[in-house]
Amino acid sequence: MKTFLIIGAASGQVPIIRKVKEMGHKTLVVSRAGPYPGLPEADLSLPIDVFDTSAIVSAAKEHKVSAVLTCQSELLLRVAASVAEELRLPGIPPSVLARIGDKATLREHCRLRGVETPKYWHVGSLSAFLDILRNVEESLVVKPVDNAGSKGVQFIPAPRNIDPCQAEKIYSESIQFSSLKQLIVEEFITGQEVVVEGAVLNGKVTPLMIGESWNIEFPGIFVPSRRFFPAAISDDAVRSIYEIDALIYHGLGEFFSVTQSEYIISARNGQIYLIDAHLRGGGACIESHIIPLVTGLDAQEKVVLSALGLRIDIPRSLTVRQHAGYVTFLLPRGRLLDALDPGGVEGIPGVHYHGLRGLTAGREIPESKNKSARFGPIVIHGDSRKDLYQTRDTLKATIKLRVETNRGICGPHWE
């Protein structure tokens, strides 16, 4: 039995904690104090700030850990990489994360490898930000270079016409989510969003599956409402996207990681643009639940084995066993009038797993600003894309939540 250090105890860490224990090992979780769902799952937990690398290293040495893991968070991934390097344990080298670990360095990495990204500007001051808005006509997206969970991402539909005070507010609200105090201002591309889950093993890239992504149409934020696998796009488009994905991750070094890349196929000219890339598996249960459902590959088992430095193999090609994906929803700001019975959701045919907890009458729903405001995910599966839509429609008909808002009684936003 080995001891695994897990950094973080939020819901995204629960599947990997369970997987480590299922494989016969012990878990040591470090996290700030709080009602985090990973804490009761752990064999042992310590109240350590997840960004206090030196304290984490000291605890790891004291408890003689054999492996370091974290899931679904770029910010914690950097911490895990630094801790593993300090302890001389397997992991992604910090030097690799420095190349593609934030949105600015990722775009430079893509430029050097011939991967198309939307036109962008890298800014670190209000004056530079305002200068861009004065000189650009196209719609723009503002992104902190090192944010997480879409925090600080904002849309500007008409940059030249924006009021200077509003522009300054957008800058301030976005820059607060960057520890580097830097932003990416990017041309807004309309089209079909596509997501690729892959694996990189010692510099070789293997695509695992490809899906489509749709956002909830909610004012001012970019939040995926659902992601369905496999994608209903042409074989030529799939091949092109897989070739681009290989360019991004090929030859980065001797390590293993599940990867996730987000693309958009332009509605204007069919050009494929990279939007984001991650040296981690997809959140919202993609790595833990959806990859195994679609492909039969237990991705998190590979993650656990590689963290111990053990040899792993990734099949060069995987067949689609079934369709699967997740759906989520947002609730408007206000007071929740109804309670949701989780058992009623679990009993719906096609529902594999859901993360709906705490939806009780009287709960105050705050303003939705980023991905963390979503309710779910609800993982669904079936023999076809039609089955997924049927299950989604049943969920919408079942989850009849009412919220008392300043505009009257409103329900969930699914689309």
Give the residues covered by each predicted segment.
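Short beta-strand-to-loop capping motifs
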Residues: 156-158, 198, 329-332, 378-384
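Short, conserved charged micro-motifs
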Residues: 55, 161-167, 334-340, 384-391
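Glycine-rich active-site loop/lid that clamps phosphate-bearing ligands
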Residues: 329-360
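Active-site "cap" helix and flanking loop/linker of ATP-utilizing ligase/carboxylase catalytic domains
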Residues: 239-260, 278-338
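A conserved helix-loop-beta module that forms one wall/lid of the active-site cleft
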Residues: 85-152, 157
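Glycine-rich phosphate-binding loop signature in dinucleotide/nucleotide-binding domains
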Residues: 59-65, 134-136, 177-179
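Internal nucleotide-binding/catalytic subdomain
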Residues: 153-272, 281
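ATP-binding N-terminal substructure of ATP-dependent carboxylate-amine bond-forming enzymes
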Residues: 1-96, 127, 310-313, 322, ...
